[in-house]
Amino acid sequence: MKNIKANKVVLVGDGAVGSSYAFAMVAQGVADEFVIVDIAVDKVKGDVLDLNHGMPYGESPSIIKAGSYEDCSDADLVVITAGAPQKPGETRLDLVEKNTKIFKSIVGQIMDSGFDGIFLIAANPVDVLTYVTKKVSGLPKERVIGSGTILDTARFKYELGAEFGIAPESVNASIIGEHGDSELAVWSQTSIAGQNLYDILKSNPEKEKRIEEIFLNTRDAAYDIIQAKGATYYGIAMGLLHISKAILRNQNLVLTVSSYLEGEYGNEDVYIGVPTLVNRAGAVKIYETSLNEKETKEFNHSVEVLKDITKSVDKLFQ
């Protein structure tokens, strides 16, 4: 009988986001082998032992272990959550220089192992650090993916679902652009249980005043959570789980991940959150959502915000 290749995932970064992602992956048994790498070796040992103790009660992978960058040599997916954390009052883009230096080191060591799989990046500012990862790794754009606006989209669906009294799964809505202050809601394509939002507002004008508030709640959610408890991690961990399943199980899902534009939306040479087909080969196709004039202007502004930052990143490579 022909051997079936096991799915191997390496997580780099065992902080709050990383350990939450590890728990979600192990609980759902998404990987056959799950390896955790972090400079805090005692923390990793503790988490590995803790996760292994839960194996009898979950759909766990057959192997959960502490490892090193050498373990990336035959990994299908490397997920990087490592990096300096976002502090209260600090924007994601404030983190650029220090996390770029961290990523140059991490990605360089991963590539030295012989890694030839897919990168999934979740450290902030995620669009910029995904760009850095592509630049350092030299891998094709399809195999370097950022978490993008997948969490923002989930927050948006949650807010809309709560407003209209339906499950978020019955909301068709997207946040695109930078995972940060310049992101935008694609209101023109938003539907609630199959009905266009604008049509709903015509018959429910009292809802109109809530629309901007819903977007602001979505955009600023991270700051609210950080102020309340210091960091966000459960939501993004679930988003990373969703992306990982799309890759490892070849699900062909369209997700608002951070993808590399090469002319799509009239822009290029930038990683940004856009609807993208994700499967075993990575981020294989970008879908150009129809945007109205206002949304197009906002998206182009988001591109410029990110390009201004990547210009400073490029200088760090000179």
UniProtKB/Swiss-Prot annotation:
One of its GO terms (biological process) is lactate metabolic process. The keyword tRNA-binding does not apply. SUPFAM superfamilies: LDH C-terminal domain-like, NAD(P)-binding Rossmann-fold domains. Its main location: cytoplasm. NAD(+) binds at residues 17, 38, 43, 69, 83-84, 105, 122-124, 147. It is found in: Cytoplasm. Substrate binds at residues 86, 92, 124-127, 152-155, 232. GO terms for molecular function: L-lactate dehydrogenase activity. Its EC number is 1.1.1.27. NCBIfam families: L-LDH-NAD (TIGR01771), PRK00066.1 (NF000824), PRK06223.1 (NF004863). Belongs to the LDH/MDH superfamily. LDH family. Catalyzes the conversion of lactate to pyruvate. This is L-lactate dehydrogenase. It comes from Staphylococcus carnosus (strain TM300). The lineage of its organism: Bacteria, Bacillati, Bacillota, Bacilli, Bacillales.
